[in-house]
């Protein structure tokens, strides 16, 4: 079992997830996940897939304000999700290297932390980790 996190996907906040997913699908050649019968106007989260695996996600944020880059009053913002074989081991690891666990934990299969400068990231339980851990898969 590997206690080190493995990057699951990268999520970007945005005002229109479908539009931004379409843009990045065209940039990368990756596929936007199928909506099925889900109404496009209600999409608040959508992922780009590399085969069966998500790689990028786009999350709707009401009143989204674009960052000013490379300098300006609103720095660039994003969050990362990392797969782990075991949430407890992953937590010990990230706390040991300087992360802070947030008081609010909204789910059972993931945990939210802050990096040393306050950006949120999640450790997500990888339910189907390959035998021998994620590093072997």
For each of these PLM feature ranges, what is it?
Residues 1-2, 70:
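A detector for short, charged/polar N-terminal pre-domain segments
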Residues 71-94:
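Mid-chain, well-packed structural core segment of small domains
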Residues 77, 99-119:
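A short, hydrophobic/aromatic-rich structural module that often spans a beta strand
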Residues 68-70, 101-102, 133-134:
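A short, polar/proline- and glycine-enriched secondary-structure boundary/capping micro-motif
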Residues 128-137:
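A short, polar/charged loop-to-alpha-helix boundary motif
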Residues 31-74, 116, 120-127:
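Conserved short beta-strand elements that form part of the metal-binding/catalytic scaffold
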Residues 2-5, 11-56, 89-92, 96, ...:
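Core segments of cupin and vicinal oxygen chelate
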Residues 13, 83, 107:
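Charged, low-complexity surface patches
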């Amino acid at each position: 079992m590997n206690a080190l996190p493995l990057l699951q996907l990268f999520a970007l906040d945005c005002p229109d997830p479908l539009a931004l997913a379409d843009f990045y699908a065209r940039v990368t050649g990756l596929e936007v996940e199928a909506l099925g019968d889900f109404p496009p106007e209600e999409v608040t989260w959508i992922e780009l897939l590399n085969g069966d695996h998500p790689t990028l996600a786009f999350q709707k944020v009401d009143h989204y304000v674009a960052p000013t880059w490379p300098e300006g009053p609103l720095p660039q913002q994003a969050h990362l999700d990392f797969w782990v074989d075991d949430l407890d081991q992953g937590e010990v690891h990230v706390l040991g290297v300087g992360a802070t666990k947030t008081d609010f934990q909204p789910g059972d299969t993931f945990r939210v932390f802050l990096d040393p400068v306050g950006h949120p990231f999640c450790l997500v339980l990888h339910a189907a980790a390959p035998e021998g851990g994620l590093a072997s898969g």
